[in-house]
């Protein structure tokens, strides 16, 4: 499952997909079109053409997890449609999943300290 502190990337597949696809077809898309290993633990967010639905695919170490969410009103905020993926931070992913405009969520990056204490 998607857990806090997850180090593996969370990616949006920017091109809409056919939402009749299940976990096997989406995993095949990850492998053939996005050139990623769907069993690596990477989280991939897929969008519908209407923009009000997402499917989230992730391998949790024991099996493929497919989450399907439909907004009752409105649509999700999406990047421009193009080939490929776009990386999301954990905070951006959580905002997207809540139906918020994740593009406004910017984490402050702080370099790690060089020494403890």
Give each language-model segment a name.
Residues 1-117:
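Polybasic/polar functional segments that serve as interface/processing modules
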């Amino acid at each position: 499952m998607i857990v806090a502190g997850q180090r593996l990337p969370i990616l949006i597949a920017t091109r809409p997909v056919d939402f009749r696809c299940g976990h096997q077809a989406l995993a095949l898309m990850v492998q053939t079109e996005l050139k990623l290993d769907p069993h690596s633990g990477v989280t991939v967010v897929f969008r519908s053409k209407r923009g009000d639905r997402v499917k989230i695919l992730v391998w949790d170490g024991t099996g493929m997890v497919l989450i399907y969410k439909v907004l009752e009103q409105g649509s999700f905020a999406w990047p421009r449609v193009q080939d490929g993926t776009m990386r999301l931070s954990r905070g951006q992913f959580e905002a997207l999943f809540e139906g918020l405009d994740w593009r406004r969520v910017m984490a402050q990056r702080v370099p790690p300290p060089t020494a403890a204490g």
